[in-house]
Amino acid sequence: MTQWIAGQWVAGQGDAMTSVSPYNNEVVWQGDSATPAQVESAVAAARDAFLVWKKLSFAEREAIVLNFAEKVKENSEEIAQIIAKETGKPIWETRTEAGAMAGKIAISIRAYHERTGEASREAAGNQIVLRHRPLGVMAVFGPYNFPGHLPNGHIVPALLSGNTVVFKPSEQTPWTGEFAMKLWQEAGLPAGVINLVQGAKETGIALADAKGLDGVLFTGSANTGHILHRQFAGQPGKMLALEMGGNNPMVISDQFGDADATVYTIIQSAFISAGQRCTCARRLYVPVGEKGDQLLDKLVAATLKIRVDQPFAEPAPFMGPQISEAAAKFILDAQANLQSLGGVSLVEAKAGEAAFVSPGIIDATNIAELPDEEYFGPLLQVVRYQSLEQAVELANDTRFGLSAGLVSTDDSEWEYFVDHIRAGIVNRNRQLTGASGDAPFGGPGASGNLRPSAYYAADYCAYPMASMEGGETQLPATFSPGIEL
């Protein structure tokens, strides 16, 4: 029973699907995908439930969400184990994600009050009131790299505002989605308020096509996000929020400070989660000259020592595998393509068992036209530069705009960088993947269109209703011209 529709666990009636551990190819979950007809049933159930759910007080909705938070805390180790088995991420990392699933709920509750609560004031004998109302039925598309807390950052704000949800997890991580749904069930969520539909492309297309949707919250690849954007063109009545990827630049100044700390920051930026974070550094700009050479030598030496292993291995690895063998092949093919264009591998990424790929670094300085692609894995491209102005110009040469960073102890360099760089998340002397939990997450260009994560998700889950109110109608002292009573 892999689908949760209208408060019932039902079997999918579509194609068989499995979840395979990418580190040993063991099947850890299996079921059948939802058909388009089942997706329509899920949307209809959400539509019916919306009429009741939106009428509950905020306190009543909040109580159920807080019950869910407690269930997450009680089951945090099992959540971490499931995510590790489905994604291959080290258990220390998935434990952090399980903690974030519960931790970000408090952010969403605060955001509801601060961004979409109710306010009133008196002006010229009128009561001016601002209220917020839910949109209706929201589709949430979850990613595989953070299958627990990223969907939660959409689902929780949607529910708090009074919306109902149809949730489609990534087909790579159905087990995590199913387990989270069971925790919502245990928390006392009424039937139909969240509906779970599992499946791959056909299920996703059916959900995006459903006529009963009022909004879509999507986290995933730029390619899929652009398809959704075209699909929703001409439908201004539907809210579409896209969180997509990036071809993220990291610029290292001559004034980078401590070399070991800089190397550590680069590794954390490029290879955390085996490079499978949308904010990971993809392009590293290093100054020409002796200092840059020495830094690269240190980076190469440290990269060769990175421990890559199964999620539960001891001693603990820094990196696990790619999400699938297809994803691993994509990284190796990208490396081969860059080599054919003139790139020189400083550390060659190599295939291991199952979906393992070791981290790779390739000097792409001599590539005439660097492909503007997101290589979603542990492949870092290095480009040498002559001046900070040139580095920033090269860094901005991308259709994406998610994250960027500068490593420099020089305040004037930082002022120039932050004034000229084009990105939504811009860090100084910190890893590119770091961001505050209540910061707007996203960027311009092909990286997305809104910032619908955790705190700022509140903006996209409710619409403002402005009212001017009086206790009774009134006659003015002077009528408008042309009116007689």
Swiss-Prot record:
Instruction: Cite the EC number.
Output: 1.2.1.71
Keywords (A to Z) from UniProt: Arginine metabolism, NAD, Oxidoreductase
Under the heading SUPFAM superfamilies, the entry gives: ALDH-like (SSF53720)
Task: Name the domain of life.
Answer: Bacteria
Q: Do you know which InterPro entries this protein is assigned to?
A: Ald_DH/histidinol_DH, Ald_DH_C, Ald_DH_CS_CYS, Ald_DH_CS_GLU, Ald_DH_N, Aldehyde_DH_dom, SuccinylGlu_semiald_DH_AstD
Per the Swiss-Prot or TrEMBL record, the active site comprises E243, C278
Q: Which GO terms describe its molecular function?
A: succinylglutamate-semialdehyde dehydrogenase activity
A biological-process GO annotation: arginine catabolic process to glutamate
Q: In which pathway does it act?
A: Amino-acid degradation; L-arginine degradation via AST pathway; L-glutamate and succinate from L-arginine: step 4/5
**Which reaction(s) are listed as its catalytic activity?**
N-succinyl-L-glutamate 5-semialdehyde + NAD(+) + H2O = N-succinyl-L-glutamate + NADH + 2 H(+)
The signal sequence is none
Q: What role does this protein play?
A: Catalyzes the NAD-dependent reduction of succinylglutamate semialdehyde into succinylglutamate.
Spell out the family assignment given in the record's similarity comment: Belongs to the aldehyde dehydrogenase family. AstD subfamily.
Name this polypeptide is given:
N-succinylglutamate 5-semialdehyde dehydrogenase
User: Which source organism does the UniProt entry give?
Assistant: Vibrio atlanticus (strain LGP32) (Vibrio splendidus (strain Mel32))
> Gene that codes for this?
astD
